[in-house]
């Protein structure tokens, strides 16, 4: 994955990390919450964590928004042949973050098989395709952006906004030439 694509993705997503307008007091638990968090599903066969592409993306995003604390979460799944386990972990993490850190701006991302996991999270609204705990209605309000790299699922489903309009305008889908 070209460094230029990662930098371009960070430039597109950085404005989406502007804080939520809020009239309600921030819960006490939010004091330890990051301003934004990237939940990233690594590519197939990569070791646990956010992976090479995810790490480069998070670092690029941090350099574009240095005034904001940006956490990262490596989706916990085997990264072998199925995206469903990654989608379930990502969905559970998003729901947990929304409950414990309601003002944290969430960025979902994935590379290769991890992009397919993120696709499941944003596309599937009922248990299906191995996703057992889809995001409840309204959860998209906590998601500032979706960044997909090497997303093979796009060839089958099309772009994310086509099947999940709530993410139109806040999704990027980068592929290398020939992907």
Where are the predicted features?
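Extended aliphatic helical segments
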Residues: 7, 12, 38, 50-53, ...
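Secretory targeting and sorting signals
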Residues: 1-25
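Residue-identity detector for glycine
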Residues: 15, 35, 43, 49-55, ...
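Small-side-chain structural scaffolding
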Residues: 18, 23-24, 41, 68, ...
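Active-site catalytic motif of lipid deacylating hydrolases and related acyltransferases
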Residues: 30-105, 174-179
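Serine-dependent carboxylesterase/thioesterase catalytic core
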Residues: 88-172
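Generic structural motif recognizing short loop/turn segments at the entrances and edges of beta-strands
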Residues: 9, 22, 71, 167-170
